Amino acid sequence: VIRTAQHNTYGMAFLKSEPNVLYFTDSDTRHCIYKLDMNAEVLEVVQVSGGTGVAGHRDGDLNQSLFNNPSMIYQDSQDNLYVADEGNHCIRRITPEKQVETVLGIPGKAGWQDGAKESALFNRPKGICIDKDDNIYVCDYGNARIRKLSIN
């Protein structure tokens, strides 16, 4: 469909509310989330998160948010997008209102610990998927584990 030569694209997802818009991550070099309207007359990659080439951690409005090596992205039944933010060692959520929030993990702190948002630790989470009951599974790469998450 389109060449993403400047992008290290790993994760992709469609939302029910935007069935023709493909969201995808750019890991390693640009640290961003992009979208591509598949019905557009001219296909154009549009950056939707902040910080081209700037790794960081910032929650809030999607267009001002910062990620650090976002790898996989997946949608739930409520049209939230979940992002495995590998470099920040966190799981992030993008709401239908385009707000970004850290739902589990401590930004910049790698480790292994189950627990609440303030105490759970990951080490380079890469893969993420969600089953039909909205259970979230994460490939916690640095800990060599697949983890099932409970997010309220």
Model-derived features: positions:
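Gly/Pro-rich loop segments of beta-rich domains
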Residues: 1-10, 42-71, 99-126, 152
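Residue-level detector of Asp-centered blade-edge/turn motifs that repeat once per structural unit
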Residues: 14-19, 75-78, 130-133
